[in-house]
Amino acid sequence: MKIYLSPSTQENNIGKGEYGTEEKRMNQLTDIIEVQLKRYGHEIFRNTPTMTLKQAVADSNKHNPDIHVAIHSNASTGKARGAVVFCYKFGGEGERLARAIYNELEKVTPTKDLGVRESNNHFGIGKPLYETAYTHAPAALIEVDFHDNPEGAKWILENMNEIATAIVTG
């Protein structure tokens, strides 16, 4: 299977404690995911930290993968916790991918998670999450937990291998 991995490129999105940036940590997580997927014989393509969202989506579409997986950590008020996985709309391959990943991720997270959600109107009517809307391949965008919550940031840092394995299994 051909898989496009797209870790966050948000270099200014800082987490709590020792977390550092979302870009650094999600690229670190994606490094682990990539190694695991290659062990299963999958062909992996991936964005680079210097790419914009539009460039990453264009690169994904150029490689024509079977699936596109965006890997992020979330931010809110500093109090929220839990994983959430987005697909563009319910009813298609993107939803199946998102649910498969979520079902495995939910097994390793220490809190009540936030489920699988549609992203077609994420930023308002007709304003979707870019990576779920404009990739040609079925796409899922994962938010593994909240990096602006001290416990969430710590959990991500201490459980990279478990999180990666859950994503790969999904």
How would you label these PLM feature ranges?
Residues Y4-S6, E11-N13, H63, H68-T77, ...:
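Active-site-adjacent mobile loop/cap segments within catalytic or ligand-binding domains
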Residues M1-K2, L37-E43, H63-H68, V108-K112, ...:
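Loop/turn elements at helix/coil->beta-strand transitions in domains of secreted/extracellular proteins
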Residues M1-V57, H63:
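Active-site histidine-acidic residue metal-binding/catalytic motifs
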Residues Q28-K38, E95-P110, G152-G170:
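Long, well-ordered alpha-helical scaffolding segments within enzyme catalytic domains
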Residues L53-D59, H63, I67-A70, T77-Y88, ...:
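N-terminal catalytic cores of peptidoglycan-degrading enzymes
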